[in-house]
Regions:
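Amphipathic alpha-helical binding modules
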Residues: 74-110
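Conserved mixed alpha/beta catalytic, RNA-binding, or beta-rich assembly cores of soluble enzyme
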Residues: 3-6, 10-14, 18-30, 34, ...
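Short amphipathic alpha-helical segments that mediate assembly, nucleic-acid/protein binding
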Residues: 5-6, 22, 45-48, 64, ...
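Amphipathic alpha-helical interaction modules
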Residues: 19-69
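Short, hydrophobic/amphipathic alpha-helical patches that form generic packing surfaces
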Residues: 7-14, 50-51, 65-73
Length: 110
């Protein structure tokens, strides 16, 4: 469930941070979450973001703004700008998760 969503989120992280940094980030985030960070992001983005803030402090917001911008620029997200993306992460809950799931999708073919 959410395989395409998780693929695009992982592409964003790898593109922005590089594979080695993503591996380190995943280690620390997944140690706190007890499971795959991309699965948690899909199911409960607020919980994911809370853990990311615990680890990175104010850098978590900067990173997630970059992720949102990357998703938009590469055609993987529609209808959410970085400000709204952060607002949904901070809000959390099922409604926020569903809004993100609808916004993140394969890019349109031209």
């Amino acid at each position: 469930m959410g395989g395409v969503f998780k693929l695009f989120i992982s592409r964003a992280f790898e593109s922005l941070l590089g594979p080695t940094s993503v591996m380190a980030l995943r280690f620390h985030v997944e140690r706190r979450l007890g499971r795959d960070m991309y699965e948690v992001f899909y199911e409960d983005p607020g919980r994911f973001y809370k853990v990311l803030r615990e680890l990175l402090g104010s850098g978590a917001e900067m990173l997630m703004r970059l992720v949102a911008r990357w998703l938009n620029e590469n055609g993987y997200m529609e209808g959410l700008d970085p400000d709204k993306f952060i607002e949904l992460l901070e809000k959390g809950g099922e409604e926020a998760a569903e809004r993100m799931r609808r916004a993140i999708k394969p890019p349109y073919r031209r």
